[in-house]
């Protein structure tokens, strides 16, 4: 009987991986928040971070993505604390953060607050002193001409050793380590680092086996259409770079619309939209550096167009600081001036079906795209639900004339809390870098 049940599950998952929905039902209207445990609190521990869970729940966060929680290698370490992405042991916890029981308590608290938690998974490489090397598995790695471990080619990652995906035993060990966190800590999925550098057939196999343990949510740090075979969500890197370009007058606002026009991803796949993340913040600058005075305008855009909105820890404090990557650099939580701003955006995404993810929601209908004035107006609607968004990316005050048969009735203003009756023709005023969001 057990064999028959296992075969049935395998066949169901095989069908799922060949065109049906992969994403768990709970993700349909989810939002996501990236957590850097080291920098989140002065203590830099799971226990200290846990005090923020109720606040994040209230802010409208559904998925917590934790940057790697594993021990960091000592060999060739960068800085005094090292990179999270140079992993020493896939089945252990970084002692900086606490122990496995501390992590399990955090996961339980997250679940008790009706949220989900995924962890960063670095499958492309390990630290050179990973336990696999200690165990004599040197053949699990890419070796140079002299038979030594080597970092991933084309990078400055001298603190890691590249893995060899031609080795089937290594693949099995990797999947088993991923299963470890499902069975021992009850996490809800993985954000997979440089996922496009790992063969897609590995990810398909991994997804199939993981889903047989627990239905997982999978996020790929990649923007390649083949990733949809195994992942529920990929990065919206192209959109992010267009937003930076518009802010810096290197791109036109029409490039934003064109991005969605040419999208060929399956309708049930999610893209992750963001104005910041750990890579952008530490290496390319804060959103204030990259986007200037329009950083909030782009946050509104990224939260309300098609895609799942990401908030990087500290953005709700107007974090205008590049967090150090290899050293302790605690976020200052005294100034929480954007908590209400992000709470409004995230909770609207969660509650209004027009904004839901993939084909649970709707595509944006751009009714005004003005390159000269740097303004955009779009509508998203699903059934009787509708969201209207007007954005001014320029430093000049604007009055925009709206004409659309799609608009009619009483609308709520997201930020002013006022109710407004509108019809197919009306005017809307926008301050420099201003925005208005109406919904029903």
Can you say where each PLM-predicted feature lies in the sequence?
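Substrate-binding/active-site clefts of carbohydrate-active enzymes
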Residues: 20-32, 36-47, 51-62, 68-185, ...
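Active-site-proximal helices and loops of the catalytic beta/alpha 8
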Residues: 183, 193-274, 290, 301, ...
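Carbohydrate-interacting/catalytic domains
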Residues: 19-65, 71, 104, 110, ...
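Short, solvent-exposed helix-loop connector elements
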Residues: 283-289
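Hydrophobic targeting/anchoring helices
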Residues: 296-304
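Short, flexible loop/turn elements at secondary-structure junctions
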Residues: 37-41, 70, 94, 123, ...
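Bacterial Sec-dependent N-terminal signal peptides
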Residues: 1-21
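Structural recognition of the beta-strand scaffold that forms the well-ordered cores
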Residues: 31-34, 63-68, 118-119, 189-191, ...
